[in-house]
UniProtKB/Swiss-Prot annotation:
GO biological process, one term: DNA-templated transcription termination
InterPro entries: AAA+_ATPase, ATPase_F1/V1/A1_a/bsu_nucl-bd, CSD, NA-bd_OB-fold, P-loop_NTPase, Rho_factor_ATP-bd, Rho_RNA-bd, Term_rho
Domain called Rho RNA-BD: residue spans: 146-221
Entry annotated with the keyword Transcription regulation: yes
SMART domains documented for this protein: AAA, CSP
Molecular-function annotations in GO: ATP binding; ATP hydrolysis activity; ATP-dependent activity, acting on RNA; helicase activity; RNA binding
Gene name for this UniProt entry: rho
Record-listed E.C. numbers: 3.6.4.-
Keyword Hydrolase included in the entry's annotation: yes
Protein's name in the database: Transcription termination factor Rho
Length: 515
């Protein structure tokens, strides 16, 4: 019994793992022996061996068949070079490396690191990034260097779990880390928990890295997770703290939202948009405003059924975490990504964090659930199963302000005027579930008036909790003026006047003076 690792026998837990339940393993696997020469002292070197299998699963090759020697000469100097380049760090008398940061590096850089430790170039160029990192962990472990890993826990029905990474959109892959049932029970772990701890490379007959020591859970001491209140038992309140989207030299879009559809912490906001009305650009503006004004708010952008080029553009345009499932992926993949994101957000809120999820779009997520849910035999108009909208509603309904501390804000886009009866039914189901609506107008976008926001139809429930009495009275006056004019003319004049003022405070003062 290993008392240092929480009173459980890690080795027996690993061996109990039936990996065939998670992956389809091909028959006739060939095993090769990798000879790793690790320098143990200045006088001699010892040759060690371990088995790596040419295993394939539904996600591709995990480990290739290869056989080579790593020379002990120069290994110690190359490790010192990694220390100088800040890849290997030193803390509390011990060398360590945070392995998940290697996944963010280009494969060429990872290959260069592995080659620097003695791997032949002709072999390294044939290996995938996962294989290179696997080998690197093995070499570093042999040289008494701790390997640390951060990932989001996905607990499976059999009681054990795996740590998924954001670089793989929290989906299963060869870089996952096994977490034993004993660890999950000991620390009361749930899907979505962010674990940080020491891992080791697979041993004989194993296929995954394994967590051997948990150092933190959701950036807090592991013991905190044992006594936390579950998300569903927390007390929801109306949003009462405004998320200010205005900053110096900001876009008119966020200034308009700040006045006519204010967003609070815990808001359940719906951006209703026809095609080509600028919803993606608007989401980028909102994301940049949040990251600029609130460094403590955790921002996640979830893109479902999206075009790959738009995913790249979003990653490069905003500072938050972007999780995406492209339109060429299966519907089940869309669902899995979305569920991992919402579970991660819930765990953070349980730790009194303020989280914002920007979802594009709730319509596509509902379509994915409609394809993956077992049929109930009750089909609504448009081909929507009556049970299919339950889970996307639970996703959207998770947004709330928490009395005990923390909040989950969800700003989701809903597609309309697409020509699809299904999209129309989905929008009607979600129309009354939010507490803030921002309506984008296709007629304004066609006339190249951006932001194409229909001020008359947009608004926030309980906006008196987010705006001062003075602001409300002046905004009410503007709404009355806009109510008597054409939509295009009213928005055009409003935008022109706002552009002449530096910020909303100055703009409201000019309006009160009759200008």
């Amino acid at each position: 019994m290993d008392k240092k690792n929480g009173g459980f026998d890690l080795e027996s837990e690993i061996r109990r793992l039936d990996v065939s339940k998670e992956f389809k393993i091909e028959d006739n696997l060939k095993k090769k022996v990798v000879k790793v020469v690790a320098k143990k002292d200045s006088a001699s070197s010892v040759t060690k061996s371990a088995d790596l299998s040419g295993v394939k699963d539904s996600n591709g090759v995990i480990f290739s068949d290869f056989d080579y020697d790593i020379p002990s000469s120069g290994l110690e100097n190359n490790i010192k070079t990694l220390e100088q380049s800040n890849i290997i760090k030193f803390f509390n008398g011990k060398d360590y490396v945070e392995i998940e940061k290697l996944y963010d590096k280009p494969i060429t850089e990872v290959r260069k690191i592995v080659e620097g430790l003695g791997t032949n170039h002709t072999i390294a160029v044939t290996m995938k990034k996962t294989e290179l990192i696997f080998l690197l962990v093995k070499i570093l472990s042999e040289n008494n260097i701790d390997v640390l890993f951060t990932g989001v826990l996905d607990v499976l029905s059999d009681g054990y779990g795996f740590l998924r990474t954001a670089s793989n959109s929290y989906l299963s892959g060869g870089n996952d880390v096994y977490v034993s049932p004993s660890q999950i029970r000991l620390f009361n772990l749930r899907t979505g928990d962010i674990l940080y701890g020491q891992i080791r490379s697979p041993r004989d007959g194993e296929r995954f890295f394994a967590m051997v020591k948990i150092k933190s859970i959701n950036d807090q001491d592991p013991t905190f997770a044992q006594n936390r209140i579950p998300f569903d038992n927390l007390t929801p309140l109306y949003p009462n703290v405004k998320l200010n989207l205005e900053y110096e030299n900001c876009n008119i879009s966020t200034r308009l939202i700040n006045l006519f559809s204010p967003i609070g912490k815990g808001q359940r906001a719906l951006i209703v948009s026809p095609p080509k009305a600028g919803k993606t650009t608007l989401l980028q503006k909102i994301a940049n405003a949040i990251t600029t004004n609130y460094s403590d708010v955790i921002l996640m952008i979830l893109l479902i059924d999206e075009r790959p080029e738009e995913v790249t553009d979003m990653i490069r345009s905003v500072k938050g975490e972007v999780i995406a499932s492209n339109f060429d992926e299966q519907a089940s993949r869309h669902v899995q990504v979305a569920e991992m994101v919402i579970e991660k957000a819930k765990r953070l809120v349980e730790n009194k964090k303020d989280v914002v999820i920007l979802l594009d779009s709730i319509t596509r997520l509902a379509r994915a659930y409609n394809q993956t849910m077992p049929t109930s035999g009750k089909i609504l108009s448009g081909g929507v199963d009556s049970n299919a909208l339950h889970k996307p509603k639970r996703f959207f309904g998770s947004a709330r302000n928490i009395e005990e501390g923390g909040s989950l804000t969800i700003i989701a886009t809903a597609l309309v005027d697409t020509g699809s009866k299904m999209d129309e039914v989905i929008f009607e189901e979600f129309k009354s579930t939010g507490n803030m609506e921002l309506i984008l107008d296709r007629s304004l976008a066609d006339r190249r008036l951006f932001p194409a926001i229909n001020i008359k139809k947009s608004g926030t429930r309980k906006e008196e909790l987010l705006l001062s009495e003075e602001e409300r009275s002046k905004i009410l006056l503007i709404r009355r003026i806009l109510g008597g004019v054409d939509d295009y003319e009213g928005v055009e004049v409003l935008i022109e006047k706002m552009k002449k003022s530096k910020n909303n405070e100055i703009f409201l003062k000019t309006m009160s003076n009759g200008n």
